[in-house]
UniProtKB/Swiss-Prot annotation:
Single annotated GO MF: tRNA pseudouridine(38-40) synthase activity
Subunit structure: Homodimer.
Reaction(s) this enzyme catalyzes, per UniProt: uridine(38/39/40) in tRNA = pseudouridine(38/39/40) in tRNA
SUPFAM superfamilies: Pseudouridine synthase
Binding site residues for substrate: 110
Purpose: Formation of pseudouridine at positions 38, 39 and 40 in the anticodon stem and loop of transfer RNAs.
Coiled-coil region: none
Catalytic residue positions: 52 (nucleophile)
CDD domains: PseudoU_synth_EcTruA (cd02570)
Record protein name field: tRNA pseudouridine synthase A
Annotated EC: 5.4.99.12
A matching Pfam family: PseudoU_synth_1
HAMAP family for this protein: TruA
Length: 270
């Protein structure tokens, strides 16, 4: 039996989330339906990251065990011919038998996109959170670096957690850019794994720093669990799962070396 890995991107606006659910349309559900139509097999796919309703992905990874004899290129072309317009397979590859999209991952990377223009862009309304007040990105960048390292991120999580709430954050930064003349603020964070709502709570609190509502000390108090009142959950539609990385690839499933059998095109980089 083969173990096929897929690199996927999707617009999360019209999904109830990435994981299969009984109450609505999920990314996993449409992927499994497309797989069955292509191969005739009913298979359960494993996704690397669980994304909430409205959250998007540029580098989600899934794996599926299969008896199909389709080539990798046929799998990519076939799935993309079946999948709806808001989901696409960017690449596929033969994975080792013990590869597991979720448990084999060693690093996940998220990006949060904020529309920081004087008026919100209609083109970004489902793909960036709008904040009208000009954000102090220098202050945000200085403060967000507090999360780098090994910490208990329970104060930034919601709901019950499985196992330890300690995570290793490898990178955190805040930058400013433009798309079509519209000012954007980008918050990038990478860690070995994330808790439920961890990134959105971090970003929502960080926005308050950028607005001048709280200072670095109060941000630190939120991280320590001493000031839950200052914690704010940012909207889902500004969040993107950008990449999932594995020890055997050295570069990550969202990088171009994995793309010979996938889709190659010029894209706007948010």
């Amino acid at each position: 039996m083969r173990n096929i890995a897929l690199r996927i991107e999707y617009d999360g606006a019209d999904f109830v989330g990435s994981q299969w659910q009984t109450n609505g349309r999920s990314v996993q559900g449409v992927l499994e339906a497309a797989w069955q139509q292509l191969t005739g097999e009913r298979r359960r796919m494993t996704l690397a990251g669980r994304t909430d309703a409205g959250v998007h992905a540029r580098g989600q990874v899934a794996n599926v065990r299969t008896d199909t004899r389709h080539t990798i290129s046929t799998i990519v072309r076939g799935l993309n011919g079946i999948l709806p317009e808001d989901v696409g397979v960017l690449a596929a590859w033969e994975a080792p038998d013990d590869f597991h999209a979720r448990y084999s991952a060693v690093r996940r990377e998220y990006r949060y996109v904020i529309d920081n223009g004087r008026t919100p862009s209609p083109l970004l309304r489902r793909h960036a959170a709008y904040v009208p007040r000009r954000l102090d990105t220098a202050a945000m960048d200085a403060v967000v670096r507090q999360v780098i390292g090994t910490h208990d991120f329970a104060p930034l999580s919601d709901g019950p957690q499985e196992g330890s709430t300690v995570r290793i954050c490898y990178e955190a930064r805040c930058t400013r850019t433009e798309v079509w003349g519209q000012p954007l603020v980008l918050i990038d964070i990478a860690a070995n794994a994330f808790l439920r709502h961890m990134v959105r709570n971090l970003v929502g609190t960080l926005i308050q720093v950028g607005e001048g509502r709280i200072d670095a000390d109060r941000f630190a108090a939120v991280l320590a669990g001493d000031d839950r009142r200052a914690r704010v959950l940012a909207p889902a539609h500004g969040l993107y799962l950008m990449a999932v990385r594995y020890p055997e690839d050295g570069t990550g499933a969202a990088d171009e070396p994995a793309a010979p059998h996938g889709v190659t095109e010029t894209r706007m980089q948010l």
